[in-house]
Swiss-Prot record:
<dbReference type="GO" id="GO:0005737">
    <property type="term" value="C:cytoplasm"/>
</dbReference>
<dbReference type="InterPro" id="IPR036116">
    <property type="entry name" value="FN3_sf"/>
</dbReference>
<feature type="domain" description="Fibronectin type-III">
    <location>
        <begin position="177"/>
        <end position="270"/>
    </location>
</feature>
<dbReference type="InterPro" id="IPR003961">
    <property type="entry name" value="FN3_dom"/>
</dbReference>
<comment type="similarity">
    <text>Belongs to the cytokine receptor-like factor 3 family.</text>
</comment>
<dbReference type="InterPro" id="IPR013783">
    <property type="entry name" value="Ig-like_fold"/>
</dbReference>
<keyword id="KW-0963">Cytoplasm</keyword>
<keyword id="KW-0175">Coiled coil</keyword>
<protein>
    <recommendedName>
        <fullName>Cytokine receptor-like factor 3</fullName>
    </recommendedName>
</protein>
<feature type="coiled-coil region">
    <location>
        <begin position="9"/>
        <end position="87"/>
    </location>
</feature>
<comment type="function">
    <text>May play a role in the negative regulation of cell cycle progression.</text>
</comment>
């Protein structure tokens, strides 16, 4: 009994030790998270202070420059008015000085004439004759003070009050950005970014999403629009990327502060079309297929069976050509050398919107395909049936969506499979399809 009791106590002791170790690890992880939170507050505060100081330094410089330019403009205007109106007065000044000089000369000559030898009428005659010719009764017009400019500066003293009001409302400090990244979901060769508003009072008109590799120094704009999610394509697998989002308020021009940086990666290899099909031309990343004008046509399949249950497979039709009833975009279990995906062990959507399951057309349809249309496939394995000669049967719940409409049905496969191929077939050229 004592041995059993001792063994029980030992077991309890080891369990307590494990619990204490796990508790310690959890606390240490929370301490790391707490330190990250502390650093975010301190670093964002320092960055905000630097941004505020730099903004106001730039603003002061710009305002001082504008005020100096305005002052110089007004001073030049004063100088121009002064010069323009002083010139006539200078001309009048010259006439007056000339008249004074003439009068002085006449005075001297007259005084000499009258103080000369008595009876010398010739000198008196010459003087009076000269005085008559000088028109001593003709005086130049001198403008009165009310007729000449009296310059002054009109300064609107309310301007300072208006500026003060604007300055008091200039800028703001927010403890949190109005929008944050909510979820990052890995997709094959892509990452789905979802964001949401954190401020109910903020009315967002547009959102702006940027991303970069962890090793890059600059962010790139990848989306600007009103949606609250976006799939970022051309993501290299197993490489960390950083994402951030901001918003623009209704009727505003400036963007809000950026959200907290979020890092994510995808471990899923990108979907690719197979090479070597004469009827199709592929992009460099082999995720875009263009039906060319080659006479050969048939189904273009994926490079491998990369579509897994539980994932979302999306086709975006970039350009369209002439429709044909045998056209189709969809998924299949196996690759067959055939003309269309409208066959057994395949599900597809025709360009007219008809849905085919194992070669049979369904009653429900989707809208016809048009430029920019997206067709998404979502599948979920429901049950595994009894085993037959080829293996256990499998039922999948399939949801196909396009243009805000969807078709839901169960797809029964005679044998189970972990992954599916995707494919497309177009009879006529001009169709271009992006897969992701």
């Amino acid at each position: 009994m004592e041995g059993e009791a001792g063994g029980t106590l030992m077991q309890e002791a080891w369990e307590s030790i494990d619990a204490a170790r796990n508790y310690k690890n959890e606390l240490q992880e929370r301490m790391i998270a707490l330190e990250l939170a502390r650093n975010q507050i301190k670093e964002s505060a320092a960055q905000t202070c630097h941004a505020l100081r730099q903004h106001f330094v730039d603003l002061k410089t710009a305002i001082t420059k504008l005020l100096d330019e305005r002052q110089e403009t007004l001073l030049q205007e004063v100088s121009a008015i002064e010069q323009e109106n002083i010139k006539p007065l200078d001309d009048c000044q010259k006439l007056l000085e000339q008249g004074v000089n003439t009068a002085d000369d006449l005075l001297k000559e007259g005084e000499m004439a009258v103080s000369g030898i008595a009876g010398n009428n010739e000198n008196l005659y010459n003087f009076t004759n000269k005085a008559l010719h000088n028109q001593l009764d003709s005086l130049p017009e001198v403008p009165s003070l009310v007729e000449v400019p009296c310059l002054s500066a009109q300064l609107d003293e309310i301007f300072l009050c208006v500026v003060r009001d604007h300055i008091c409302k200039l800028g703001s400090v927010a403890s949190r950005p109005p929008v944050q990244i909510e979820e990052l979901i890995e997709r094959p060769g892509a990452i789905l970014v979802k964001w949401c508003k954190c401020d109910d009072d903020f009315v967002a008109q547009d959102y702006r999403l940027q991303y970069r590799k962890n090793t890059a120094s600059h962010f790139e704009d990848v989306y600007v629009g009103s949606e609250s999610e976006f799939i970022v394509l051309q993501i290299d697998p197993n490489v960390d990327y950083q994402f951030r989002v901001c918003a623009r308020g209704d009727g505003r021009q400036e963007w809000s502060p950026w959200s907290v940086l979020q890092t994510s990666r995808t471990t899923l290899v990108p979907h690719e079309w197979s090479t070597g099909y004469d009827g199709y031309s592929l992009s460099s990343r082999r995720n875009i297929a263009l039906r060319n004008d080659s006479v050969s046509h048939g189904v273009l399949y994926s490079k491998a069976a990369t579509y897994l249950s539980g994932q979302t497979l999306t086709f975006r039709v970039e350009t369209v050509g002439q429709m044909d009833k045998h056209d189709g975009i969809g998924v299949c279990v196996e690759q067959f050398d055939c003309e269309s995906l409208q066959r057994d062990k395949a599900v597809c959507v025709s360009t007219s919107g008809a849905v085919y399951v194992n070669g049979k057309e369904m009653t429900n349809q989707l809208p016809p395909v048009s430029p920019g249309s997206t067709i998404t496939f979502d599948m979920e394995i429901m049950t595994l049936g009894q085993t037959n000669n080829e293996g256990p049967s499998q039922k999948r719940r399939v949801t196909i969506s396009s243009s805000n409409r969807e078709v839901v049905f169960d797809w029964l496969l005679e044998q189970s499979c972990d992954s599916l191929y995707f494919g497309c077939s177009f009879v006529h050229p001009g169709w271009k399809v992006l897969v992701f």
